[in-house]
């Protein structure tokens, strides 16, 4: 007899034994089918046929387990996996073989997850699991036959149990664990029956699979999955019954699916998810609950999955994490409730999904998040109610969507749940949905709840894509204001671009080439470059106090010169702060032309038009918010007041007291007329108002007592202080002469002068209380006399005037009248760093005879503390900026070079200023260098004669 015939006979005998054992097992389980077993031997024994220990396909036992791997044959073979130890779980991952056989191998462990791949045949195959037993469990594979076989798990018992599967009949096929493939795997349940429950999963295909839960009956439920298809999947939930129920969620698919969850039952409920697929899965165990709680890890698809465990609840709670698909999925379980709570997270599709379950309520609630599709979806939980609540959340479509309440049966991808309660009173159900929030589909981010609105961004300008002239400006402390701008002239736009380039380029102090300026002009307008350059130069001179001069006519290079120079200045437009003061004059002009008040949004629009609000903010202005709300307001150039009866609150700008003092409306009107290329009389109302103010000022100058915001009595009373009758001034009637000695009065006056000079750099008003705190409270009786003495010293010695800034608050400030020729042209400035040694180098070259060897200049810098490597950087920068030029020394071997003054140095400073600088450093007089002094005098005379012929860009206006 051949070996094949012997093996066939042995298999037939094993199949016959398994059939006999299966019939006896059916008779034994039939009485207990309708409900739970009467006796529970222990905590490790399954509590019912719907226990997760049976449904997961593995049996826990206290003793050792034995696994026998069958030999593959031509016919279908069946393998029964052995039991494992306590607290161990196993998931079977099948592999495909050529023969029709199924093999499951479980490795026993103590708390670890074991996966054994069974062999899947092309034909029908059978996979049977064993029930848990307290004793030794022995598993033996049956004999395969040519017919399909059916395996039935054994009944758990206290002793040793042996499970032999019977021979399969010609009836329906059994459960096969799916093979993980590139697509998501799916398990499908069968219809309900009165027999024991046998989960039979199908072979996974690359396409979509279908999950159909069984219809529960009064007996034990049996789930038999149908064949997976690539079409549309529709899971149908079972009806509620009094016995235990089994719920299995649908698996992910690439198509759209409709899922209807089962209604909640009065008994215990256990939920199970399918086996993991190819992707990674992360599951967090559930927290402890007062009742029985079962948590099953989700099935991982191709994308990562994150499952958050449910919070403890008062009753029985079953939490089933989602089954991730190709996209990212995040599931947040429900919060604790007093009653029974069942939460089933969504089944994500290809796109990311974010699900937030409802807040806790007093009654029992069932919450089902939406099923994610290709797009992203964000669902917001409702507010908690007193009674049972029902939360219906939408499914995510292909585009970003917001959370709305869909009607059941509208179409696929609709998931809804009913309220689970004992009385099932629909009138007590409340549905509360907050305002929907739309999320971006391009951002893959996990969110556990709705995020708050973004905080206001100061000085933010938002432009509408559909309407280019419509912008939204966020001011200092106001909400967003929508403004419709007038269309900008293309010529003015080119002028603004060129203006921005000139200001930024000037920070580096490098000469500006004409070719570089042409690059910032649109090609269609480059033929009008002279007109654009003329307008930009006019803006530079009027607003920023810079003069555009031609440095080299042959190379066509230009530089910017600060116009705050050699002539005495009067008023605000000639102040040393330069560009900031020019910007302030624009703000004052806007306020004056707008009716002596301007809203914050209008000021922001004007600054935006000037380029201050762009992303490339100029360091020449610093922080625009600080410039408006801190510097100009604190210095009392501007007043910042809220608009009355306006919601939301808006603010307006007005002229401050310092602006009324340091300038006039006529000067501001002429300045604005120069900017807009108009005549001051083009604004007749403002022009008449400015004339009336000038007449009032002229009339007030003839009186000793001046009105508000005018120069006080200090200017007129300063000459009377020296005479014995000086106390006959405005204070003679109020305050009697004091008995203080003259020396003490002079000492207090000098201290007061030091205070004013110290506070002059901050431009902050000095109140009377602060002055008395500094010089002493005892000086309050002689305070007017001390002010007169200090005003006389400041006027005659320092060239400044002490004026009353605010008579009501008794605050004072200095009005500076110093001439710019008394200060150096080239000084250290935060806007022009790197000039710390420029005046030293230029003075050294002039003292050395207008030229100095390169080695001598480096030795001079080394004497000033400059490091060896940095002296080369300093001289190279001055050479490139044309402050100095390098000439080769004739007949020098090796070749040597000497430095001389460059064209920029001759424009920005003079030899007399350099000589005075050296004399101040060495504590000498300029005449101590007679040769250099005579040369400096001749240079001053030549500058006076040819000053109007120095490299000007002609015909600006």
UniProtKB/Swiss-Prot annotation:
Residues 85-96, 104-130, 158-177, 220-232, 256-306, 328-344, 364-380, 414-428 have a biased composition (Polar residues). Gene3D superfamilies: MAGE homology domain, winged helix WH1 motif, MAGE homology domain, winged helix WH2 motif. Its main location: cytoplasm. It is found in: Cytoplasm, Perinuclear region; Nucleus; Cell membrane. GO terms for cellular component: dendrite; nucleus; perinuclear region of cytoplasm; plasma membrane; postsynaptic membrane. Residues 138-156 have a biased composition (Low complexity). Residues 1-433 are annotated as: Disordered. Residues 491-690, 745-936 form the MAGE domain. Residues 743-957 are annotated as: Interaction with DTNA. Keywords: Cell membrane, Cytoplasm, Membrane, Nucleus, Repeat, Tumor antigen, Ubl conjugation pathway. One of its GO terms (biological process) is negative regulation of transcription by RNA polymerase II. It comes from the Eukaryota. The keyword Cytoplasm applies. Interacts with DTNA. Interacts with TRIM28. May enhance ubiquitin ligase activity of RING-type zinc finger-containing E3 ubiquitin-protein ligases. Proposed to act through recruitment and/or stabilization of the Ubl-conjugating enzyme (E2) at the E3:substrate complex. This is Melanoma-associated antigen E1. It comes from Macaca fascicularis (Crab-eating macaque). The gene is MAGEE1.
């Amino acid at each position: 007899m051949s070996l094949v015939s012997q093996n066939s006979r042995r298999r037939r005998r094993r199949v016959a034994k398994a059939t006999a054992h299966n019939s006896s097992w059916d008779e034994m389980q039939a009485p207990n089918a309708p409900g739970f077993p009467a006796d529970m031997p222990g905590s490790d024994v399954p509590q019912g046929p719907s226990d997760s220990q049976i449904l997961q396909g593995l049996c826990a036992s206290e003793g050792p387990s034995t696994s026998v791997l069958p030999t593959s044959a031509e016919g279908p073979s069946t393998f029964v996996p052995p039991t494992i130890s306590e607290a161990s779980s196993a998931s079977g991952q099948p592999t495909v073989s050529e023969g029709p056989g199924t093999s499951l191998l479980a490795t026993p462990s103590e708390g670890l997850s074991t996966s054994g791949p069974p062999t899947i045949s092309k034909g029908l195959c059978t996979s049977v699991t064993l029930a848990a037993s307290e004793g030794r469990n022995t598993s033996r594979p049956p004999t395969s036959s040519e017919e399909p076989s059916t395996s039935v798990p054994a009944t758990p018992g206290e002793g040793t149990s042996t499970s032999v599967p019977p021979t399969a009949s010609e009836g329906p096929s059994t459960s096969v664990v799916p093979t993980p493939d590139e697509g998501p795997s799916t398990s499908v349940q069968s219809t309900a029956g009165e027999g024991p429950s046998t989960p039979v999963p199908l072979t996974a295909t690359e396409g979509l699979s279908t999950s159909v839960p069984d219809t529960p009956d009064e007996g034990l439920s049996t789930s038999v999955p149908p064949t997976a298809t690539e079409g549309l999947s529709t899971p149908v939930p079972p009806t509620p019954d009094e016995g235990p129920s089994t719920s299995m969620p649908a698996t992910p698919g690439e198509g759209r699916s409709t899922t209807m969850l089962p209604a909640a039952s009065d008994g215990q409920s256990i939920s199970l998810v399918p086996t993991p697929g190819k992707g990674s899965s992360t599951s967090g165990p559930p927290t402890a609950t007062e009742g029985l709680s079962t948590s099953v890890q989700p099935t991982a698809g191709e994308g990562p999955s994150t499952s958050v465990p449910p919070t403890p609840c008062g009753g029985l709670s079953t939490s089933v994490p989602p089954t991730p698909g190709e996209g990212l999925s995040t599931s947040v379980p429900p919060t604790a409730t007093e009653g029974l709570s069942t939460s089933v997270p969504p089944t994500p599709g290809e796109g990311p999904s974010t699900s937030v379950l409802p807040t806790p309520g007093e009654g029992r609630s069932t919450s089902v998040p939406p099923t994610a599709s290709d797009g992203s979806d964000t669902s917001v939980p409702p507010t908690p109610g007193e009674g049972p609540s029902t939360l219906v959340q939408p499914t995510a479509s292909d585009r970003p969507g917001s959370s709305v309440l869909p009607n059941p049966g509208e179409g696929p991808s609709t998931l809804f749940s009913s309220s689970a309660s004992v009385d099932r009173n629909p009138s007590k159900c409340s549905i509360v949905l907050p305002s929907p929030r739309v999320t971006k589909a391009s951002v893959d981010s996990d969110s556990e709840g709705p995020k708050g609105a973004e905080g206001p961004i100061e000085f933010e300008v938002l432009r509408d894509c559909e309407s280019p002239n419509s912008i939204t400006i966020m001011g200092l402390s106001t909400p967003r204001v929508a403004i419709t701008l007038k269309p900008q002239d293309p010529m003015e736009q080119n002028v603004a671009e060129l203006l921005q380039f000139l200001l930024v380029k000037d920070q580096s102090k490098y000469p500006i080439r004409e070719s570089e300026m042409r690059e910032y002009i649109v090609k269609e307008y480059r033929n009008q470059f002279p007109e654009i350059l003329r307008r930009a130069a006019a803006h530079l001179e009027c607003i920023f106090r810079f003069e555009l001069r031609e440095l080299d006519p042959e190379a066509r290079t230009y530089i910017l010169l600060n116009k705050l120079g050699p002539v005495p200045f009067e008023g605000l437009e000639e102040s040393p702060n330069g560009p900031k003061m020019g910007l302030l004059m624009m703000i004052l002009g806007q306020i004056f032309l707008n009716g002596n008040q301007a809203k914050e949004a209008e000021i922001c629009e004007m600054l935006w038009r000037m380029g201050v609000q762009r992303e490339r903010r100029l360091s020449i202005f610093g922080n625009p918010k600080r410039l408006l709300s801190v510097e100009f307001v604190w210095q009392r150039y501007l007043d910042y007041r809220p608009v009355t009866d306006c919601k939301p609150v808006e603010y307006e700008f007005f002229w401050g007291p310092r602006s009324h003092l340091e300038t006039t409306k006529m000067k501001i009107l002429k300045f604005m007329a120069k900017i807009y290329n108009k005549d001051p009389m083009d604004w007749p109302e403002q022009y008449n108002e400015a004339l009336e103010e000038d007449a009032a000022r002229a009339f007030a100058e003839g009186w000793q007592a001046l009105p508000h915001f005018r120069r006080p009595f200090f200017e007129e009373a300063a000459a009377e202080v020296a005479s014995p009758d000086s106390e006959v001034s405005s204070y003679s009637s109020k305050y009697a002469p004091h008995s203080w000695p003259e020396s003490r009065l002079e000492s207090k006056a000098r201290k007061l002068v030091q205070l004013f000079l110290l506070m002059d750099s901050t431009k902050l008003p000095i109140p009377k209380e602060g002055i008395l705190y500094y010089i002493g409270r005892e000086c309050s009786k002689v305070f007017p006399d001390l002010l007169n003495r200090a005003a006389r010293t400041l006027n005659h010695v320092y060239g400044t005037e002490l004026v009353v800034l605010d008579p009501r608050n008794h605050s004072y400030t200095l009005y500076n009248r110093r001439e710019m020729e008394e200060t150096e042209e080239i000084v250290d400035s935060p806007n022009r760093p790197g000039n710390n040694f420029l005046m030293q180098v230029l003075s050294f070259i002039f003292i050395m005879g207008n030229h100095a060897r390169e080695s001598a200049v480096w030795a001079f810098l080394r004497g000033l503390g400059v490091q060896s490597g940095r002296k080369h950087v300093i001289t190279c920068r001055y050479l490139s900026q044309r402050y100095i030029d390098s000439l080769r020394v004739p007949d020098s071997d090796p070749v040597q070079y000497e430095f001389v003054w460059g064209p920029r140095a001759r424009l920005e400073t003079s030899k007399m200023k350099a000589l005075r600088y050296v004399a101040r450093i060495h504590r000498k007089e300029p005449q101590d260098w007679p040769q250099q002094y005579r040369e400096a005098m001749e240079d001053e005379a030549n500058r006076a004669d040819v000053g109007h012929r120095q490299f000007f860009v002609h015909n600006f206006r």
